Amino acid sequence: MLLWYFWIYSFLGYLLEKGFAKVTGAKLQGRKCFLLFPLCPVYGLGMLAVLVLPEALIRGVPGIIVCGVAATAVEYGVHWFYDAFLGVRFWDYSRVFGNLRGRICLQFSLIWGGLTAVVIRWIHPAVERLAERTVPEVTYLCLMVFALDAFCSLRLLKATGDPERLRADRG
């Protein structure tokens, strides 16, 4: 089920990024990190980090803080991986107040905390039901296609250093 959580939250993150860019009038830029699948893995990995925490840690106001810190740690790690190993940056907070090396910033750390609280309370129960209904054969097939997509995407990023090359729609 964790694999489906990753995929679903990565896809929802992609949709959120597209919506955020549209609402804020942000410069049109690519939001996905794979050639085929419209996924933002930082969202999927961030939610996995939150979901593996003990339930007692993720409830109430302290839980919002814990979840925000967990998701922010993932955001930092994902940014570091892309930068260190592939030479690409999908986001840069260096001009945002309270940033750390342009990888994370206070504003989005607070948003992570609130977003994870909303997801845990209202969205995750539906995601959990959906993941439980998926037959193993579909999971294996999706995993093979995803692994091929990830391999090709990582090679393209490493070769070009240009995340825009991943986008057929250029957006």
Where are these regions (language model features)?
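Aromatic-rich, lipid-facing transmembrane alpha helices and their immediate juxtamembrane interface loops
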Residues: 1-171
